[in-house]
């Protein structure tokens, strides 16, 4: 998960959270709290101030109000550069990496960067010096020169980004820091990869798109679930036509995080839990949205055009606190307004439907749903099962293992990859570094990052407007109509 002091009892195939150093709660406002406060949760970056912050007792907005605000935000600003769709990396024999954020996620991902051939970790950054130094020790233990350590406060990442000997900056910090860090990296000439979600506001998403186009630097949402074995197999099968014409899909982040969010040692500070006091919508859509968007070639022949969201009451976190937390715990000052479960329906330009769910507050088994349906059959994950005509005609699910021949070449060549989450983390890092070394087009880009993250603010607004369908911006500015490469890549010649 984002920031921890000890390993978590997580399922092997559980997706990661972004995260690294977060200062413990204190009386004086941190840069993180100032960033969020001055940004204005009430607006979520799309002029929502009049609609309220999401307080459970606040009046709901009207559909016309919500539609007006979302339409204004969906309108593409004047382009400042040229499209980054289909733009290749420069190509280098060695990729020089700087890592910002060395908590639970960043502290484990550094092992994978070190395991990939042709990668050198040149710099590490975390305001908690002990974490930064532990990461630096991993670099030297791997036989690389000692990296420069940046640990002089929350702004020291800016000095890392200014270095002239970095090609790529990896960001794994609390969510509210993702946008300023990605922005700083690109302004200093670095390609940047950010853990989920890449930003929390629509205006920030547009800024990242414009910066990527203007600076000619790639800005990527590092969505590891796109590289899961099942996800990549379904992707290849979908593109080969085994599901027929695609109709619908579903993805989710349904993962009971109550124990971890209230654990004083797992995250450094309550930043993850505090998001449930700010927004009512889907805080973490990327793990479910990314793979299904790939199946449907979103931004590569289709696009996500609208979203409608509803949410349950916010009950479970307060109930958990009542049962588990002692009187006087800082959490008793918090008012939770984030829906226990949000359900969103995304419609594409071709009329397809994608269902997204988010629930980290109530008791349930882990699931990303990961389903895809078409005119010839359907796949559903958790547990994995498939039904395809003409093979299946008895109304009984079939064994997905029978379709192993459709595994992506990455999984055929790396059958037992190192790292967590069933190997998808390593696959993502390996493939990204390979694209950078060989001068290939990245599997996903800033337009995918913005599209997969747009449900964060838009679901909040739609829920406030009682489920009103709202437009999703076309971050590609029309480029989505063109067929281009994506995660379903061919094996390159080394």
Swiss-Prot record:
One Pfam family per UniProt: GFO_IDH_MocA
Keywords of the record: Glycosidase, Hydrolase, NAD, Signal
Residues the record lists as binding substrate: 253, 272, 284-287, 366
Record PTM text: Predicted to be exported by the Tat system. The position of the signal peptide cleavage has not been experimentally proven.
Chain coiled-coil ranges: none
Sequence segments annotated as region (Disordered): 1-32
One example GO MF annotation: nucleotide binding
Signal sequence coordinates: 1-58
EC number, UniProt record: 3.2.1.-
Binding-site residues, NAD(+): 104-105, 126, 175-178, 195-196, 224, 284
Manner of cofactor binding, per the entry note: Binds 1 NAD(+) per subunit. The NAD(+) cannot dissociate.
CC cofactor: NAD(+)
Group of enzyme by EC: hydrolase
Reported function: Glycosidase.
UniProt similarity note: Belongs to the Gfo/Idh/MocA family. Glycosyl hydrolase 109 subfamily.
Name under which the protein is recorded: Glycosyl hydrolase family 109 protein
Organism encoding this protein: Streptomyces griseus subsp. griseus (strain JCM 4626 / CBS 651.72 / NBRC 13350 / KCC S-0626 / ISP 5235)
